[in-house]
Amino acid sequence: MLRAIAEERGRLSLRREVCGLGCFKDDRIVFWTWMFSTYFMEKLAPRQDDMLFYVRRKRAYTGSESTADGRKAEAEPEVEVEVYRRDSKKLPGLGDPDIDWEESVCLNLILQKLDYMVTCAVCTRADGGDIHIHRKKSQQVFASPSKHPMDSKGEESKMSYPNIFFMIDSFEEVFSDMTVGEGEMVCVELVASDKTNMFQGVIFQGSIRYEALKKVYDNRVSVAARMAQKMSFGFYKYNNMEFVRMKGPQGKGHAEMAVSRVSTGDTSPYGTEDSSPASPMHERVTSFSTPPTPERNNRPAFFSPSLKRKVPRNRIAEMKKSHSANDSEEFFREDDGGADLHNATNLRSRSLSGTGRSLVGSWLKLSRADGNFLLYAHLTYVTLPLHRILTDILEVRQKPILMT
């Protein structure tokens, strides 16, 4: 199946060079409907879900709006992911013109035909550039076109397609022993493989140093939380977990880490967070690879049968692009000083609101402890655009590094 898709993508590139974008459209529809019927409707693998995913693309109504030059404004297509059981009588017909059959094949391939293993490791880099792994943990994860907040329970899933999420709901238990200290870094690697384990390739790699995590953590320490702790005579219990989003190399997806301070038995309010809106922090997220022994957990439920989201036209065009194979090679290079501040790290916090922060901000800097302390670094999820996963699977096929 992977070979057939790769060959079709190659033929498409050749056809575009010969006769332009509009050539062989009907031929391509025949190919993708045949692929969908053959590999998902007729062939049922032993571990394959009894579900089919369809990407429906419609034109939204624009009314009488027009552009500055007088032309009629084109409507942004509305994308809807529909989910049906294989034996449902409501399955869309193979000739349905509103179904994007190519994307439907690719989505079902990523969700059902591949296995995924994520590895989180605490490492150090030697002077020669080699990576030394001190401890690591691997966990099987599942691809989903939907997401839900990791800092709250019971919230309904929302559509994320074309971004695919690999979530670890029990991240605090799975990565309970992942602590990072001075001079160390946290490395994340996500690997895809087929059901027979004949194919294996890295689809995400990233790393972040302890110093960057600690800087984020320190900058989120909440003066308001400290004051509330004192004024409530200890009855106020703060939550000291921060969610740090790490961008992948060259913007290739991102991973989220739940960061908290390892308790030392000190009950003082040092180490609480600033719960003000996320302040911009920057850390270069470099690349690399993934997994040893998997631990299976139950596959999560997928979301509602019909999920809608408008996708800009330029995003659709972007999904069709091929991407270079060197997205992950920066992990092997030495950090270049000031360049470490180029990738923004977005933060989310589930701490107390920062009331009075502006009044006592300078006092915070004076009273903050300068010493280093251990941090928990729990991986919560990895997310990647569908087209980047396809490119890594079909073209790049980078070998894992963390897997031994």
Swiss-Prot record:
This is Uncharacterized protein KIAA0930 homolog. Residues 262-307, 320-340 are annotated as: Disordered. Keywords: Phosphoprotein. InterPro entries: DUF2045. Residues 320-336 have a biased composition (Basic and acidic residues). The modification Phosphoserine is found at S268, S276, S279, S304, S306, S324, S358, S362. It comes from Rattus norvegicus (Rat). The keyword Phosphoprotein applies. Residues 262-278 have a biased composition (Polar residues). Signal peptide: none annotated. The modification Phosphothreonine is found at T290, T293. It comes from the Eukaryota. PANTHER family: KIAA0930, ZGC:172139. Pfam families: DUF2045 (PF09741). Transmembrane segments: none annotated.
